[in-house]
Structure formats: structure tokens, C-alpha cells
């Protein structure tokens, strides 16, 4: 059975048109049992590909195309955990060297973008034979980039063959496409040079780990090269391998690939000419079609299936371990955590014995779950970060769902009492979810936050910690501008279109765009406007480049670069993994968010300025009932006041007229998409002013909605509503919260709604009360 072992996705950044999910789904539809994803110089799309392939029932094989300093791109496949680690470390060495020597990452330079290039056979630019180029460093590549000769600067950008040899264990090498090292050597140095390069690869990887790659994509000179490759494979005793090296999931994505090529080379479709691929053959092909194409060489097809079986490694065998916390002698992680939590509980609840007794029970329950899930080390490491901040007099505050944990409160990670506030612990941690908790720490932005980040590097090593990535994608306005330039639309029309489509950010990108473009003064029947709509829709959510998450850090026991490749971050002294926070979370890699807040910097500066004048301020001891402060709030005198400085907040403050601290909690929560979309703001304000009676959809909701006058304003209330009316467990309630997330899934929401209705029906809640509860909950789908 044929298996494609050299696919490229959109995570080759403008060199592929299909998302990893689309490739996996197409391979499954073609009844391929496996698929290998080999993106350029990275494993950026590997986690998404792994999840999608697992979901559709095919085996997700891992690899990458590695740019060589000597020229060409070398496809490498991970056969074992050792091979995967070697691939990650090879890619890391390539990427991080740019930071060490001050070189930028290789990317299309402006000089390379559309001026002085003629067509390569694969559709990428090749330098014209100018006098300045003759014999001075530019060699022709058939497939991809202009291939420079091995100069010092270029040696520092790509991986050398010596470095590849150092990391060859557990890897299988393919000889590559027209941009591979073998084809490049054949074209520039002739058969002798190509034979030398092939022998070098065999010496590096071993005869059983080098496959001579054949492709038939209706391209000039392809068969001549294939004949030479077949003869050399026979001479060397190497197996042949048929691939199509697809950049598309389906042939119909060719217009999108052309647009991406234009974006990459800063040109238009009108002017791109031979920059574009010369046909649409680089798509995932059905096995029978590959068998027909290679009818004269059936072993090349058969070898693909046999090699796919041999490639046993998937991301399931990632081997990530969270760091061990250095414990005092004789202590276990859970024992030391119990000791710290009990000591903190005695301090936190010293003034209220009744609450202290409730807190003891809650902390014991949480610690039991933490022990079962083996998470004690995680809490100790976050506690260690907080303690470092305190030692260094850096303001620090836990935020988010961690505030629902009595253990976090006792450890001093958070400042909200979840026992007194009756917060739902399962919102933070649940045995049913089977994943790591997520604790976010707010820090003063600037140098103080950077000191904490550097402390993490010092504690766990430069190769043991890194920032998480943020994948910047084509969406809305940005996508419109790029597509408009590709189509050579007038600048004023591009600007009009980009403003218009920005209003569609939170809708389905295909939501009758062509019809609605008339609103922007466009003729939807015009060929370029029609093509704009098609390309704008197709490019949505494709990756544009890799950014850095605002504060997420991942840490590892040992070397993180054996788990995921690292790259230099834009800021000196930092590194970033090639995966975003969702990818890391899905693969069990633990993230801690160290988030910088300008307001915390302002507070810290103010505290230090007051201390210099002899006034010591403790934020925890400031009175929460100062009438002067509430008078200012009621008058909307809040310019520059964190959380209540927006126009919407200032417009609402005189109507809500906060009088106590809990009123401020409501004030901040009420100006959010959930309450606004759900039409909850005005009912709450009317009830607060006594102009409307307080009612609840069902008596079981009265204790949950009492403090907010029968109107659900907090996600916490929604989860408790689901538990009270539909019998949801804490874990099921957390699933509901996820379905309500910003990137919500219509399918997931439909499943949750059906489960809510069934649960309420079992408890006798039907008709209008059930509908009112459903409306209240689903209104938070953008919250």
C-alpha cells in the first residue's frame, strides 16, 4: 500500500497551502494508513497533525526538511524516540546559532523577491545569470530557494553535514525532491558530485536508512533525473521510494498556493510569472494513482508502505517530564506541599475559626486530588516562583481559575478566598479532565518581569526552559490586505475591503462574503472581486509566522530541546519553542504564564516612591470600604483606573453606583460580551434600582443567582447552574466552560446543549424554564 512520506503543510510558512488537519483528513479519505509531515526546518505543525491524524485513524509520522549549509533541503524521518530527539536538537542548533552569532533567521530577502529571478522547474525563483552572480556564490536550485554556495555566513545559517552526522541516530534520510542535496549536486556538479553526496549520506545514516526518492509530477528533466537515481540506487544497493512531495491536500488548492507564493515574494499574480508552480500535481495522490505512475518501478511504491510500518515513533512517545522540585531532606513532594498548605491556612484563616474549619476540609480534598494526579511538584514550582518574587520585592498575583483553589490561596499564590466566596474547585482542576492545571501569575511589566523570566532560565537551564510560541495567522483585515495586493487591487479598494471584512472577524469566514461585498462598493460579479472572496476565505487561519506568547513558559526535566525544537526569541536572552500553548497543553507539556501588567508596574513604582518618603503601603491592608473612593467611582472619575477606565465602564458606573467591594466585582464582569450579548446588563441594573422584581428561571438556581439578583454574570455561575439543573459533574461543567471559549466549536456547543437538555429533562425541568437556562448559558459563548 502506498503511503506518502514527504508531505508539506502550511506550517512551512508560505510554502504549503494545506493545514495539517486537511492533509490528515485527505489521507484518511484516500485510505492511506499513515502520512508523514515534513515541514521546512521545523516541527511547527506536528502537534496539530498528530491530533488530527489520530482522530481520523491514520498513523501520524514525524519528520522535517532540514536546510543544509552545503545547499539543498534534506528530508529526515524520526524512526524512534532517539531519532526524534536528534531531529529536535539538530533543528535547535540551527535556529539558536543565529542568536549566538547575531545572524537573522533565513527568510526571503527583499533582494530575492521578484527582481532578477527566472523560473525554476518547481516554480520558485532562480537568479538570472547576471555578471555579478557569475561564479560568485549563487547556484541553481530546481525546487525552492536560490541555493548559495557554502560561504561562511551561509554555513552559519543551515545545518552542516557534519552536524547532521552528529544527530543521525534513529533518523531515516530521503534523498529529497528537486531541491534536495542530491538533485542540487547533480545539476551543479554533475554525476560525480551527486555520487559523492549520496555516498556521504550513506556514510552518515547507514545503508538501511537512506532511501532514494523518485517523483513523477509531469515536469521537465524529471525522468532523466529519475533514471540516474535508479541506476545509482542499484549501484549502492539502496531502496527506492516513491513520493509526490505534496504542498496541497487537493488539486483545487493551487490558486491559494499561487497566492501564498506571491505573498512570499512580494509580487502580484500578474507579475509572478515563472515564480509560480508550473502545474497542480503536488497534491496528495490516491494510492492507485501512484501505483499507476510507478508501474515500471513497483518496489518504490511498496517500500513506502514498508517504511511507514517501520517508523514506529509518534508524538505519543514524546517523553516529556515535568521538573522535580528540590525537596528538604526526608520530604516527599506531597508531604512538603501539605506542610506548606497547612502553615498558610493557619495564617490566612487566623481570624475566622468557622471558615478555617471549612478551609481545612477543602484543602484536604484538593490535596488528595493533587496527590492522585501526581501534581504536587507543579504546585511547589509555582510556589517557588512566587517566593522568589517576594524575596526580590516584586509584586506578584495569581489570576484566573487558580483563584478557585484553596491550596493556591494557602500557598499565597492567589489572594481570593475560594472557601469564603464558595468558588468551584473543579473549574481549576478535575480528575475527569486528565490534564495539568493552568496557573497564571501577574507581574509588573518591564525589567521586574524579565528578572522572573531569567530566574526560570537560571533554575532550569537555557535548554530546560523556553517561552511558548504564538502562531500569527491570516485573519480578517490582514488577510484582506495581503490578498488585495496579490490581486493588484487599487490601494483605496484594498483599504475599503480590509475595513469591511474586519467586521466579519468573529463570523464564519464563508458567511456569504461575496454577497455582502456589495456593501463595500464592489461588484460581486467582477472576476477579481470574486477571486478576492475565494482567496480571502481560503487563507483564513493559515499560519503567517511564528510569534512569542505574552508570558507562557514551559519547563522540563533535563533538556527541553529533546522534546520540541527551540528558536531564539526576538528579545535577547530568551528562547521560544516551536509550538503554541494549545499544542503544548494537548501533549502534556506544562506551561506557567508570567504575564506583565503595566498597572502592576505603576503600583510597584508608587509603593517604592512612598517608601522613599517614609510611608509604607501594604496593598493587602488597604481598606475596601473607603467612601471617598466609592464616591469617585459613582461619578465615573476613573480615567487611568485599571479595569474601569473604558468608555463602557464609565458609562455604567453612575447607573450601577457601586457601594461595596462586591459591587466592583459585578461592575467589571458586567461589561463583557457574555452579559451584553445575553441581554443581562439592563435587567441587572433595573433590579438593582428596584424597578424590576428579582426572579430566577428555576428554584434550584436561587442560591446560585441570589447575589447577582437572579441574573447570571459570571462563568462560575453558569457552571453551577449546569450542575444544579442538569446534574453535570465538575468535570462536565469544565467541558462546558471550554465549549464557551473564544474559539468555540459549533459542534461542541451543540453536543453540550443536547446534554444540558437531557439532564434538565431528567430533573423535570422543561419548557420555558429550560429554554431560559439554555439561553443564559449559550449567551456566554463569546465570554
Regions found by a protein language model. Name each.
Residues 1-103, 107, 149-783:
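Alpha-helical scaffold/interaction cores of sigma-54-like transcription cofactors
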Residues 104-154:
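Long, intrinsically disordered low-complexity tandem-repeat segments
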Amino acid at each position: 500500500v502506498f503511503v506518502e512520506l514527504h508531505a508539506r503543510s502550511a506550517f512551512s510558512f508560505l510554502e504549503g497551502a494545506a493545514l495539517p488537519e486537511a492533509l490528515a483528513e485527505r489521507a484518511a479519505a484516500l485510505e492511506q494508513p499513515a502520512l508523514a509531515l515534513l515541514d521546512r526546518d521545523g516541527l511547527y505543525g506536528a502537534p496539530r497533525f498528530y491530533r488530527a491524524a489520530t482522530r481520523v485513524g491514520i498513523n501520524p509520522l514525524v519528520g522535517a526538511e532540514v536546510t543544509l549549509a552545503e545547499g539543498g533541503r534534506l528530508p529526515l524521518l524520526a524512526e524512534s524516540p532517539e531519532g526524534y530527539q536528534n531531529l529536535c536538537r539538530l533543528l535547535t542548533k540551527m535556529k539558536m546559532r543565529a542568536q549566538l552569532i547575531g545572524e537573522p533567521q533565513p527568510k526571503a530577502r527583499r533582494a530575492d523577491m521578484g527582481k532578477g529571478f527566472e523560473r525554476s522547474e518547481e516554480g520558485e525563483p532562480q537568479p538570472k545569470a547576471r555578471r555579478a552572480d557569475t561564479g560568485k556564490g549563487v547556484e541553481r536550485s530546481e525546487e525552492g530557494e536560490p541555493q548559495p554556495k557554502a560561504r561562511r555566513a551561509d554555513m552559519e545559517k543551515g545545518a552542516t553535514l557534519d552536524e547532521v552526522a552528529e544527530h543521525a541516530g534513529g533518523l531515516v534520510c530521503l534523498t529529497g525532491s528537486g531541491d534536495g542535496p542530491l538533485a542540487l549536486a547533480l545539476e551543479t556538479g554533475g554525476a560525480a558530485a551527486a555520487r559523492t553526496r549520496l555516498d556521504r549520506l550513506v556514510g552518515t545514516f547507514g545503508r538501511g536508512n537512506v532511501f532514494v526518492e523518485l517523483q513523477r509530477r509531469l515536469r521537465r528533466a524529471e525522468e532523466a533525473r529519475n533514471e540516474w537515481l535508479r541506476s545509482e540506487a542499484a549501484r549502492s544497493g539502496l531502496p527506492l521510494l516513491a513520493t509526490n512531495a505534496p504542498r496541497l491536500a487537493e488539486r483545487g488548492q493551487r490558486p491559494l498556493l499561487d497566492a501564498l507564493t506571491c505573498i512570499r515574494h512580494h509580487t502580484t499574480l500578474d507579475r509572478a510569472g515563472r515564480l509560480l508552480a508550473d502545474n497542480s500535481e503536488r497534491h496528495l495522490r490516491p494510492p492507485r494513482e501512484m501505483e499507476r505512475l510507478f508501474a515500471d518501478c513497483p518496489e518504490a511504491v511498496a517500500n513506502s508502505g514498508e517504511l511507514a510500518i517501520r517508523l514506529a515513533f509518534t508524538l505519543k512517545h514524546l517523553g516529556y517530564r515535568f521538573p522535580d522540585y528540590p525537596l528538604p531532606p526526608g520530604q516527599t513532594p506531597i508531604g512538603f506541599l501539605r506542610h506548606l498548605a497547612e502553615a498558610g491556612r493557619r495564617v490566612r484563616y487566623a481570624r475566622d475559626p468557622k471558615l478555617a474549619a471549612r478551609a481545612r476540609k477543602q484543602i484536604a480534598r484538593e490535596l488528595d486530588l493533587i496527590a492522585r494526579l501526581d501534581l504536587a511538584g507543579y504546585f511547589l514550582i509555582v510556589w517557588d516562583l512566587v517566593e522568589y518574587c517576594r524575596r526580590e520585592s516584586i509584586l506578584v498575583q495569581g489570576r484566573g481559575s487558580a483563584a478557585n483553589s484553596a491550596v493556591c490561596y494557602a500557598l499565597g499564590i492567589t489572594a481570593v478566598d475560594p472557601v469564603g466566596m464558595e468558588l468551584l474547585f473543579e473549574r481549576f482542576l478535575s480528575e475527569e479532565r486528565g490534564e495539568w492545571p493552568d496557573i497564571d501569575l501577574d507581574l509588573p511589566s518591564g525589567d521586574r518581569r524579565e528578572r522572573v523570566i531569567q530566574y526560570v532560565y537560571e533554575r532550569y537551564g537555557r535548554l530546560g526552559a523556553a517561552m511558548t510560541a504564538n502562531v500569527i495567522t491570516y485573519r480578517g483585515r490582514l488577510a484582506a490586505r495581503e490578498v488585495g495586493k496579490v490581486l493588484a487591487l487599487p490601494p483605496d479598494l484594498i483599504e475599503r475591503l480590509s475595513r469591511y471584512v474586519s467586521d466579519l472577524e468573529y463570523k464564519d469566514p464563508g458567511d456569504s462574503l461575496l454577497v455582502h461585498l456589495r456593501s463595500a462598493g464592489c461588484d460581486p460579479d467582477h472576476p477579481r472581486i470574486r477571486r478576492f472572496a475565494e482567496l480571502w476565505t481560503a487563507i483564513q487561519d493559515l499560519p503567517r509566522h511564528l510569534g512569542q506568547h505574552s508570558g507562557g513558559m514551559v519547563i522540563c526535566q533535563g533538556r527541553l530541546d529533546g522534546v520540541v525544537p527551540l528558536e531564539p526569541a526576538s528579545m535577547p536572552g530568551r528562547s521560544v519553542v516551536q509550538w503554541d500553548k494549545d499544542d503544548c497543553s494537548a501533549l502534556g507539556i506544562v506551561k506557567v504564564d508570567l504575564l506583565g501588567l503595566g498597572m502592576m508596574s505603576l503600583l510597584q513604582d508608587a509603593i517604592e516612591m512612598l517608601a522613599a518618603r517614609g510611608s509604607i503601603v501594604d496593598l493587602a491592608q488597604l481598606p475596601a470600604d473607603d467612601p471617598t473612593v466609592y464616591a469617585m467611582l459613582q461619578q465615573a472619575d476613573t480615567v487611568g483606573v485599571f479595569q474601569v477606565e473604558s468608555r463602557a465602564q464609565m458609562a455604567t458606573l453612575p447607573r450601577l453606583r457601586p457601594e461595596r467591594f462586591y459591587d466592583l466585582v459585578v461592575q467589571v464582569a458586567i461589561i463583557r460580551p457574555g452579559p451584553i450579548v445575553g441581554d443581562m446588563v439592563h435587567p441587572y441594573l433595573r433590579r438593582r434600582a428596584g424597578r424590576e422584581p428579582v426572579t430566577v428561571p428555576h428554584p434550584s438556581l436561587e442560591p446560585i443567582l441570589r447575589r447577582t439578583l437572579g441574573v447570571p454574570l459570571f462563568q462560575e455561575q453558569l457552571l453551577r447552574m449546569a450542575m444544579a439543573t442538569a446534574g453535570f459533574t465538575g468535570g462536565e461543567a469544565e467541558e462546558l466552560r471550554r465549549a464557551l471559549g473564544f474559539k468555540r466549536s459549533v459542534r461542541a456547543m451543540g453536543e453540550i446543549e443536547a446534554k444540558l437538555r437531557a439532564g434538565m429533562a431528567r430533573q423535570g425541568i422543561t419548557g420555558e424554564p429550560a429554554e431560559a437556562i439554555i439561553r443564559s448559558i449559550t449567551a456566554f459563548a463569546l465570554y
